[in-house]
UniProtKB/Swiss-Prot annotation:
Residues reported to bind K(+): N233, T252, I254, T257
PANTHER family per the UniProt record, alphabetical: TRNA MODIFICATION GTPASE GTPBP3, TRNA MODIFICATION GTPASE GTPBP3, MITOCHONDRIAL
Pfam families associated with the record: MMR_HSR1, MnmE_helical, TrmE_N
Domain TrmE-type G: 223-383
Keyword line: Cytoplasm, GTP-binding, Hydrolase, Magnesium, Metal-binding, Nucleotide-binding, Potassium, tRNA processing
Localisation: Cytoplasm
EC class of the enzyme, as a word: hydrolase
Stored InterPro entries: G_TrmE, GTP-bd, GTP-bd_TrmE_N, GTPase_MnmE, MnmE_dom2, MnmE_helical, P-loop_NTPase, Small_GTP-bd
Protein name: tRNA modification GTPase MnmE
Gene: mnmE
Family the entry assigns: Belongs to the TRAFAC class TrmE-Era-EngA-EngB-Septin-like GTPase superfamily. TrmE GTPase family.
Length: 461
């Protein structure tokens, strides 16, 4: 275990609440807390047992005045989150008592922790690897049960085990190649280029299985960025309100009511969906509305999915066709809204013929008709209908990139072997593939990148 100074930070959100928790970790953590703690009947923390709590008060050192009534818990390293001696002070929730206790801890020798420093210490002390550390922040930011379960599996080390299994297989190939090249006179089992290629193809299949689910994983982690577009007054804001079951967007009969972008998260069977309601796209002389239209177009560029809404009670016109042309390179669903106002089936069929889309849904948002069909369509477009909660899903873009680079190096090694170049040259590519996978667990990652990853964490974590 590495030696560090003693750090402290508030582990709960700032503001009023039932309790606040101040965390302190490091070799001197027990001594520091003991110096400002006064137990019932003047009992100190000198004899506190690990993994127990003690009731008492935190006092101001100089004045000896009581700051707050507290419960102190003690976790002895290495059996703690950071693998160091760690204490947590539970005080009354509120800004003043929390700040005063934190100030006393710092005055007594602790240093204010940097964002993510507690988790970083757990990583540096070998209690967790980097993929498990990143899973901690994914758990905190989870928006659905499914995204949380996926993050929990990663935190438990499921991804790490799979990555380490592949890396161990790679290192065995490298070791065998190097032994064959360096000690040709020894009685070693001969390793041929053909045998290495077979092993590498099996490794690539394993990597492919992880990569194939990574797009789904990105959505679980960040949410499916879904943008509702269409001309003014086709029902975009009504759709947003219906999906979130709340009157978030203003709905009127006046075209152009929505002039800015409205964003909300919804949960479709565990899949987090970021729904973006945009200003109606049309030619306008209104300066403010023009800005809204430009923002709408920017949001379309960023979208994973576009829901293109049309009004069934009106004929398709040039503006509709322009929007259709603008979104043609995106994944999109066409929503034919206001079914309740359309009585002409021939006109409805004409609409469908005009549209170049496999995914056309007829709705009446006003009557909540067609919304379940829309949700099923979204699931089928991105997740083939469902995601099983027990599946290992790569949710991190950094991990996805490392897997892709590792795969490319394996393919390069196969090409080298196919050209019948000396097998020891192929070992360079295999070692690169091994190194890229090590970036996922943090075994072969640059220290600056590690610092950047932990800087994205919140204070106290």
């Amino acid at each position: 275990m590495k030696e560090f100074d003693t750090i402290t930070a508030v582990a709960t959100p700032v503001g009023e609440g039932g309790i606040s928790i101040i965390r302190i970790s490091g070799d001197k953590s027990l001594d520091i807390v003991s110096s400002i703690f006064k137990g019932k009947n003047d009992r100190s923390l000198d004899d506190i047992k690990p993994y127990s709590m003690r009731y008492g008060f935190i006092i101001e050192k100089e004045s000896k005045e009581i700051i707050d009534e507290v419960l102190v818990s003690y976790m002895k390293g290495p059996r703690s989150f950071t693998a160091e001696d760690t204490l947590e002070i539970n005080c009354h929730g509120g800004v003043i008592p929390t700040k005063k206790i934190l100030k006393e801890l710092i005055k007594s020798g602790a240093r204010l922790a940097e964002p993510g420093e507690f988790t970083k210490r757990a990583f540096l002390n070998g209690r967790i690897d980097l993929s498990q550390a990143e899973a901690v922040i994914d758990i905190i930011r989870s928006k659905t049960d499914l995204s949380m379960k996926s993050a929990l599996k990663q935190a438990e080390g499921t991804l790490s085990k799979e990555i380490n299994s592949i890396r161990n297989r790679m290192i065995k190939i490298i070791a065998h190649i190097e032994a064959t090249v360096d000690y040709p006179e020894d009685d070693l089992e001969e390793i041929t280029g053909q045998k290495i290629k077979v092993d590498l193809k099996e490794i690539i299949n394993k990597i492919d299985n992880l990569i194939s689910a990574s797009e789904e994983g990105k959505i679980l982690r960040e949410g499916l960025n879904t943008v509702i577009v269409g001309k003014p007054n086709v029902g975009k804001s009504s759709l947003l309100n219906a999906l979130i079951n709340e009157n978030k967007a203003i709905v009127t009969e006046i075209p152009g009511t929505t002039r800015d972008v409205i964003e909300e998260y919804i949960n479709i069977d565990g899949i987090p969906i970021k729904i973006v309601d945009t200003a109606g796209i049309r030619e306008t002389e209104d300066v403010v509305e023009k800005i809204g239209v430009e923002k709408s177009k920017e949001k379309i560029d960023e979208a994973d999915l576009v829901i293109f809404m049309l009004d069934l009670s009106r004929k398709i016109d040039e503006e509709d066709i322009e929007i259709m042309d603008f979104i043609k390179n995106k994944k999109y669903i066409v929503l034919l809204n206001k079914l309740d106002l359309n009585k002409d089936l021939n006109e409805e069929n004409h609409f469908i013929k005009e549209l170049d889309s496999k995914y056309i849904i007829k709705t009446s948002v006003k009557n909540n008709s067609g919304l379940n069909e829309l949700k099923e369509c979204i699931k089928n477009l991105f997740f083939s209908g469902e995601i099983k909660s027990d599946e290992l899903i790569v949710t991190n873009a950094r991990h996805q990139e490392a897997l892709i680079r590792s795969r490319e190096s394996c393919i390069q090694a196969i090409e080298t072997l196919s050209d019948e170049i000396s097998i020891d040259l192929a070992s360079i590519d295999i070692r690169n593939a091994w190194k890229y996978l090590g970036e996922i667990t943090g075994d072969t990652l640059d220290e600056n990148i590690i610092d950047k990853i932990f800087s994205e964490f919140c204070l106290g974590k």
